[in-house]
């Protein structure tokens, strides 16, 4: 499962797992600090805010050449462009600084952060074991011929984009994906339209001046159910063995797509050496 619906909003499961880990850290920190009437909730909030800022700044620095042509997009964090190690390092520095300034925080911080880290390791590890392999859902080409994702992959790493013509973020990210399909010839790109017919999809493609290969139809939106995502757009990144390497819910930017393709290439190199 990739996301959970909370009313009209689709929330990524990974974000919920992180929130659960933070709650564990806050709870344990509160219990340990009760004797000194000291909690660590405020410290955790500061750590999260600084971590987000540092992770975004590091990501932008790494992919600055991509952002250079559209600098305003640096502020659009909806593309999911964050560098986790930079955020983690910044968060730990905040914890060390706050503990150094106030001795009463040290024990609650140590126990709370340890508990939170253990909780994250356990629940994220359990979630990783549930990551689905390449779905076997039957799809159709625009010409009406049956096919599936394994047949489309042809032994290559694959990017699968779930989209619909009525979805504004889907339409905005299409030029980015179309350009990547032209450039990344070692990767198979598949565009699985969700819940619409061939005429609707073809009309959009013809009016949008997009040159896309491997556009498939999933009229029953079975692919979304198979991977556990009701959100559009959803993009899946599979290695050549059909194992899920990464996912992205929401609109991709050029930089965020480039970072995920780099991860896919790294996995491909590792599989080649094995």
Regions found by a protein language model. Give the residues of each.
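Short, solvent-exposed mixed-charge patches
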Residues: 1, 271-274
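Short loop/turn microsegments at loop-to-beta-strand junctions
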Residues: 135, 158, 232-233
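Thiol/disulfide oxidoreductase modules built on the thioredoxin-like
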Residues: 206-211, 218-269
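N-terminal "domain-start" segment that seeds a small globular fold
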Residues: 119-151
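Hydrophobic beta-strand anchors of alpha/beta hydrolase catalytic cores
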Residues: 159-160, 189, 235
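Structural microenvironment flanking redox-active thiols in thiol-disulfide oxidoreductases
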Residues: 172-208, 219-225
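Hydrophobic, membrane-interfacing alpha helices
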Residues: 1-131
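Short active-site neighborhood of thiol/selenol oxidoreductases, capturing the structured segment around
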Residues: 148-171, 177
């Amino acid at each position: 499962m990739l996301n959970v619906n909370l009313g009209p909003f689709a929330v990524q499961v990974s974000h919920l797992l992180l929130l659960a880990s933070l709650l564990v850290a806050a709870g344990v920190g509160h219990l340990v600090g009760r004797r000194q009437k000291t909690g660590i909730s405020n410290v955790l909030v500061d750590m999260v805010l600084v971590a987000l800022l540092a992770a975004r700044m590091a990501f932008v620095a790494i992919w600055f050449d991509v952002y250079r042509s559209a600098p305003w997009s640096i502020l659009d964090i909806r593309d999911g462009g964050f560098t986790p190690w930079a955020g983690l390092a910044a968060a730990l520095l905040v914890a060390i600084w706050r503990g150094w300034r106030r001795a009463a925080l040290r024990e609650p911080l140590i126990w709370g952060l340890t508990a939170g880290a253990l909780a994250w390791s356990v629940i994220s590890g359990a979630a990783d074991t549930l990551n689905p392999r390449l779905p076997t859902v039957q799809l159709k080409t625009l010409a009406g011929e049956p096919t599936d994702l394994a047949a489309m992959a042809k032994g290559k790493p694959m990017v699968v984009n779930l989209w619909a013509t009525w979805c504004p973020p889907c339409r905005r990210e299409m030029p980015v994906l179309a350009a990547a399909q032209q450039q990344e010839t070692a990767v198979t790109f598949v565009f699985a339209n969700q819940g619409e017919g061939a005429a609707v999809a073809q009309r959009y493609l013809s009016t949008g001046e997009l040159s896309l290969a491997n556009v498939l139809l999933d009229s029953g939106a079975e692919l979304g159910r198979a991977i556990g995502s009701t959100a559009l757009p959803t993009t899946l990144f599979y290695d050549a063995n059909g194992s899920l390497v990464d996912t992205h819910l929401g609109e991709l930017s050029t930089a965020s797509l480039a970072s995920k393709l780099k991860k896919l290439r790294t996995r491909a190199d590792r599989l080649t050496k094995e």
